[in-house]
Amino acid sequence: MSGVSEPLSRVKLGTLRRPEGPAEPMVVVPVDVEKEDVRILKVCFYSNSFNPGKNFKLVKCTVQTEIREIITSILLSGRIGPNIRLAECYGLRLKHMKSDEIHWLHPQMTVGEVQDKYECLHVEAEWRYDLQIRYLPEDFMESLKEDRTTLLYFYQQLRNDYMQRYASKVSEGMALQLGCLELRRFFKDMPHNALDKKSNFELLEKEVGLDLFFPKQMQENLKPKQFRKMIQQTFQQYASLREEECVMKFFNTLAGFANIDQETYRCELIQGWNITVDLVIGPKGIRQLTSQDAKPTCLAEFKQIRSIRCLPLEEGQAVLQLGIEGAPQALSIKTSSLAEAENMADLIDGYCRLQGEHQGSLIIHPRKDGEKRNSLPQIPMLNLEARRSHLSESCSIESDIYAEIPDETLRRPGGPQYGIAREDVVLNRILGEGFFGEVYEGVYTNHKGEKINVAVKTCKKDCTLDNKEKFMSEAVIMKNLDHPHIVKLIGIIEEEPTWIIMELYPYGELGHYLERNKNSLKVLTLVLYSLQICKAMAYLESINCVHRDIAVRNILVASPECVKLGDFGLSRYIEDEDYYKASVTRLPIKWMSPESINFRRFTTASDVWMFAVCMWEILSFGKQPFFWLENKDVIGVLEKGDRLPKPDLCPPVLYTLMTRCWDYDPSDRPRFTELVCSLSDVYQMEKDIAMEQERNARYRTPKILEPTAFQEPPPKPSRPKYRPPPQTNLLAPKLQFQVPEGLCASSPTLTSPMEYPSPVNSLHTPPLHRHNVFKRHSMREEDFIQPSSREEAQQLWEAEKVKMRQILDKQQKQMVEDYQWLRQEEKSLDPMVYMNDKSPLTPEKEVGYLEFTGPPQKPPRLGAQSIQPTANLDRTDDLVYLNVMELVRAVLELKNELCQLPPEGYVVVVKNVGLTLRKLIGSVDDLLPSLPSSSRTEIEGTQKLLNKDLAELINKMRLAQQNAVTSLSEECKRQMLTASHTLAVDAKNLLDAVDQAKVLANLAHPPAE
């Protein structure tokens, strides 16, 4: 390939034609450029070709090459089609394949800037450059008719988005229409009745595939014959359409379901207060949508925009400011991330170039430090007398030399006014006494004449100026807060005596409410309270505010289903630093994190610690944390690694979440946004459990007494084994899934050799078929004895009956002998050998037995975990033992079903394991008071270990879901199985610890003979 004669930056973006001759245009690379600065970008685009090699183009460029030069190079190459008239509609998208992270690249960006800003965030091979049509003319359907290449490219792009995002959501009728339109367009030369022939339709199914045209879900829901007939009938409606007509019909049909010519962003408009809206950006301008049923409201047209600016905020958020002609102030839009703001800025700037008269960019980039020093903000022009009055008011009482110059830019005249008249508030009874003064119940009459029940915090008259400022600091913070689970501030009276008026909640403090109603409150409600407070803390986290006093005494109950966080007396903003260092003041030591106790350092991470302690209070029905310790001893306990014990009713998953919040390293604690998601999952799980229990109680079926289930005799030791062909396994040769031998030894019916192969010979399991096990000889017709009379027939029937009774007696006797042999061998054999015995339960032939001379030799096990057999005790009414059995069954079910389940189905089997573990720990907690105190430490430690095992299993499950479509899928599944096996082993260890404690307490009994 050779370069064009002049740089592509000089080529006008008008009608682009492919140059004459075989040469293909490329970005010009100067001769003196070093090799390190030269790059080859692989840019993908859409086409009709099934050949992946024709759907991308390699572009050679340098780090100084601009994105618009790369776009122009592809359009000039003719790879997507000839005679492109609407080159301004195209843009370049950078997409991360694993996380779906998207960055729209501005035409003026250079390759080096893209590399430094975006590509360095992930591995280079995980990024993909896509050529997309992003900016559409106002009447795009008519405009695209003049540019056939752009029309077909936009159709391919839109159809690709439809198959990936909308195909499974539209109705069957619409999916059928859109699929037949593509079928007609794709096979434009096919006769209208071609699909009526069965051979043609089968050729379409086998050679091309219906997945290219119709969603897979639709094909699975319909019968093949019915689906074929529907396609034939619908295709007849579009058989006479030409290619362009099919495209236009596709646009019009899909437009009834999705917006094909605009992009929608969920963001907040900053207009004195924040309004959450859907911002719609398309050819008609920038519009806002407050609800799905409402009509969009126009905020600005692209011709009115004069500047675009992106400003980063804390916690990854950003503000997009649009300077609009004739508007007194910029339109400010708050987004969840800087990348989203930049994508919106590129979209708006592209439409301004397309519809405006200028070709330049309206985006104003942040200035460098040197530029900032050369430009100072304008001095505010205030009235001289006003400035003098401010200076006189701000003078210090003790000095006439220093004065504070007020910052006029911080004044917000448009904000809500919280000053109210004292005569509008009537005080009633005293609710309690705080650090600064009494708290009263009262009634406030607003300007509309409405009476509102309020709580009034008062400040003592003899309070010092410093304490008064601390008292008022709570109101200063609360007036900026607006959240459904944060106490609402009504107003402030700053004159002496100072009052802070807040909403009154009739149920009072959460701590007292929990104590009064602990017999009626359910775990589901307690988890709901924790979730609501977590949402409030996530809101405080988003505005860089630390609370520093999260406890049930500072939470008010608005209703039995709603709580609100209050008491912001210790709250502080952390704007300049990421932490707040407290001065000498009274602090809640038993709720605080180690770094807060040691260094008076308060961050969002320390609030996470306190929130977990508050959750512990809620699940303990208002008990004070570390009530058995004095304040001075708390830090020593925390430094040793001890934490608050699990409350009795606390779900294991929730306690695991608490322990994560109590990590000594603040950086390892989860953020509140993550905790909201985790608590939502726990709440949904508890809700499902409650609904299931209610359903079982409502529709409980009567118990039916059934006879004891017949169990087949266990395999005898002398039966020979065979070696069939190897059996494939999800675990692969690298990972062997082991069932604890002790569990199998103490419960032979837990797992049968036929169903769960052991790791020793799981690759050599004999195929066991029911028709082979219970095989009997057939008889010819002449073998039957023909009775000559009715009496003879009766005698033959009696003889057959006696014979069958003898056979049954013999089998029953053998079964008793086999059972006695099994109980004897359990004591001498290694339990794993019994579990791994793969001999069939009943051989095909009862001959050829080898003489039994002793127990079979234990096969070698490399790297297996040594597990002692479980104690041989009486397991009647032993709930711990039964729950351990259930847990192992749940783990085995996970192991067997993991390879068949889709990624979203992993949650079901893991949830089953979690629920079973919860029952196990609950049964241990019920038994714990009757066990010796010397054994409780080991049992509680094993319980904590099981909670950590479950958390690890959940983490591995999420990892497996994230990598379901990558090459790491099998490895993640193996890690998930390893975590589940560890959980089963630790459950067996818990059973052993409980058995030992029961023996010490004389609660264990040998099994009855």
From Swiss-Prot:
Quote the gene name from the UniProt entry.
PTK2B
Q: How is the protein disposed in the membrane?
A: Peripheral membrane protein
Alphabetized GO MF terms: ATP binding; calcium/calmodulin-dependent protein kinase activity; ionotropic glutamate receptor binding; neurotransmitter receptor regulator activity; non-membrane spanning protein tyrosine kinase activity; protein tyrosine kinase activity; signaling receptor activator activity
Q: Where is this region: Interaction with TGFB1I1?
A: 801-1009
* One of the record's GO cellular component terms: growth cone
Q: What are the residue boundaries of the FERM domain, all occurrences included?
A: 39-359
List where Pro residues composition bias occurs.
Answer: 712-725
**Which sequence positions carry the modification called Phosphoserine?**
S361, S375, S399, S762, S839, S866
Query: What is this protein called in UniProt?
Result: Protein-tyrosine kinase 2-beta
Q: Which family does it belong to?
A: Belongs to the protein kinase superfamily. Tyr protein kinase family. FAK subfamily.
- GO annotations under biological process? activation of Janus kinase activity; adaptive immune response; apoptotic process; bone resorption; cell surface receptor signaling pathway; cellular defense response; cellular response to fluid shear stress; cellular response to retinoic acid
Chain sites annotated for binding ATP: 431-439, 457, 503-509
List residues modified as Phosphothreonine: T765, T842
Q: Which reaction does it catalyse?
A: L-tyrosyl-[protein] + ATP = O-phospho-L-tyrosyl-[protein] + ADP + H(+)
Activity control mechanisms: Activated in response to stimuli that lead to increased intracellular Ca(2+) levels; this activation is indirect and may be mediated by calcium-mediated production of reactive oxygen species (ROS). Activated by autophosphorylation at Tyr-402; this creates a binding site for SRC family kinases and leads to phosphorylation at additional tyrosine residues. Phosphorylation at Tyr-402, Tyr-579 and Tyr-580 is required for optimal kinase activity. Inhibited by PF-562,271, BIRB796, PF-4618433 and by PF-431396, PF-2318841 and their derivatives.
Write out the ranges of the annotated region (Disordered): 701-725
